[in-house]
Amino acid sequence: MSKNLLIELGLEELPAYVVTPSEKQLGERLATFLTENRLSFEDIQTFSTPRRLAVRVSGLAAQQTDLTEDFKGPAKKIALDADGNFSKAAQGFVRGKGLTTDAIEFREVKGEEYVYVTKHEAGKPAKEVLLGVTEVLSAMTFPVSMHWANNSFEYIRPVHTLTVLLNDEALELDFLDIHSGRVSRGHRFLGTETTITSADSYEADLRSQFVIADAKERQEMIVEQIKAIEAAQGVQVDIDADLLNEVLNLVEFPTAFMGSFDAKYLDVPEEVLVTSMKNHQRYFVVRDQEGHLMPNFVSVRNGNDQAIENVIKGNEKVLVARLEDGEFFWREDQKLQIADLVAKLTNVTFHEKIGSLAEHMDRTRVIAASLAKEANLSAEEVTAVDRAAQIYKFDLLTGMVGEFDELQGIMGEKYARLAGEDAAVATAIREHYLPDAAGGALPETKVGAVLALADKLDTLLSFFSVGLIPSGSNDPYALRRATQGIVRILDHFGWRIPMDKLVDSLYDLSFDSLTYANKADVMNFIRARVDKMMGKAVPKDIREAVLESSTFVVPEMLAAAEALVKASHTENYKPAVESLSRAFNLAEKADASVHVDPSLFENEQENTLFAAIQGLTLAGSAAQQLEQVFVLSPVINDFFDNTMVMAEDQALKNNRLAILSDLVSKAKTIAAFNQLNTK
């Protein structure tokens, strides 16, 4: 008869960002443990609050399934000695399996006999196997860990309770000096220690102590309560998904409420108010029906509605202190001069091995000028790029950004506009930080995009030049994100700038502040980001073929990958790729100094292929270019069928290899076709 299993680990308050992934990890690790230990089950449900991680297994088998395994040993000629007795090799083999030589039998495998033994292992009761669940808890990994008391071990937070119930039976085991039982803890202020009656009563037992164990239920409660506030007050609340996920992992019993602040603070830029509420206080922003910010906020209390008015007043008081700071900095920063702030950037360190922020900006300005030409910007845009590059980091020295660093760039744009800077310059100051996340928004203006590219390129080259190169998952300076941003911006704007030539030109630049180095590492790093941009939906062989193309133009590479994926599902893909691959492989033997001499042609097929190559212009979309190459497949095959490429006559051989080399030089602008798999 199946049973239900409950495991709850009671801890000190967990960081909010750890709760959800830890809940998921616990469920996955327990499922693996049960499967590996041959304990079948029907379902696994996970639970979490800031002070607990839990999992319930439904329909758990009462006993392991029996195990029968065959083991192959040494060959018979090795297993038996000259007298026909079992050798030490045979005896050692069966001993290692916990058996005797009586279990040996011989089976023929590919014409030769080998020792075989069959081992039968009866399934153990689930109760006995579950004593090993502490291995699951020990194997949990966390971004941070700590020691406590005089213990030598470390964990995400101190462990206070461990509950392990099989139906209503408490299992006895120990974990980190905690002995398991059936006692859990209720809400820190509203509840008490409570007894969990059974695995099935878990949620109800905790609910009686003001703990909602199911994170999904807490989320639904928060959303429903906010919706009720919206209906009652006639407002709209910005239910930000990330903030919602954070808040539900800060509370065990949620109660949402609305507070207010003086409308005078609405004169401060909206971004300052939103940052104060959302990022610093974990409040939800409130708007009117037209979407305008209102002097209100919604917060979620960890508790019931008892004395809620006092809670509201306390939250309002804390927020006002933040808003006072914002109002002060907004007023005082407007007294500053951009030129004075830029001058002070010479004293701000970009990185101790690289130099000052002013030096970084100087290099960025030079790179931006080069990119502006490559991107065919207008004269007005070129001027805007140059001006933006001279000042774009000035807001880092304002009081507002010093207090609210999330507003860097945003406040720069606002202060630049107030100072009379051109709108394109001001916008670029904000946009140069974009994208600020893996799938974040991209710059919308060409000026902002060029500045963003230049800033990211110098950042990448500078850190690589001083040996600060990401390894493994370690990337403290977010260089992968910066490089991914470079790739995304180039693709978004369709700028066909050859990255290899661009990087070469940057390494030719001379700066007093820094000499660029490690170019090969930089190029490989950029290629890896293009590879990631293609995504797992693009087969590995296609990604590799595109990455080995002769033109490192990001939009064209991504388009080529997409075209090849679509083409791979067509009938002519395999024959076309195979003929092109043959041409690519032979062309590697060509002498680069030899040019095609039509007077050496001995058959019509040579002339036909050469003429087709001469007429190959590769115009249009990536799909159209690919089709133009693929239609040459019959011509290529006809050439191979009627021409001995590797002729004994050296002149003929070199000429024919030169024909193929001409073909490859054009086709390789799309992909290295000999890297494609047609099996």
UniProtKB/Swiss-Prot annotation:
UniProt superkingdom: Bacteria
Enzyme nomenclature, EC number: 6.1.1.14
Catalytic activity: tRNA(Gly) + glycine + ATP = glycyl-tRNA(Gly) + AMP + diphosphate
Subcellular location: Cytoplasm
Gene Ontology MF annotations: ATP binding; glycine-tRNA ligase activity
Pfam families on file: tRNA_synt_2f
Gene Ontology cellular component list: cytosol
Top-level EC class: ligase
Annotated PROSITE patterns: AA_TRNA_LIGASE_II_GLYAB
BP GO terms, sorted: glycyl-tRNA aminoacylation
Family per record: Belongs to the class-II aminoacyl-tRNA synthetase family.
Name of protein: Glycine--tRNA ligase beta subunit
Species whose genome carries this gene: Streptococcus pyogenes serotype M3 (strain ATCC BAA-595 / MGAS315)
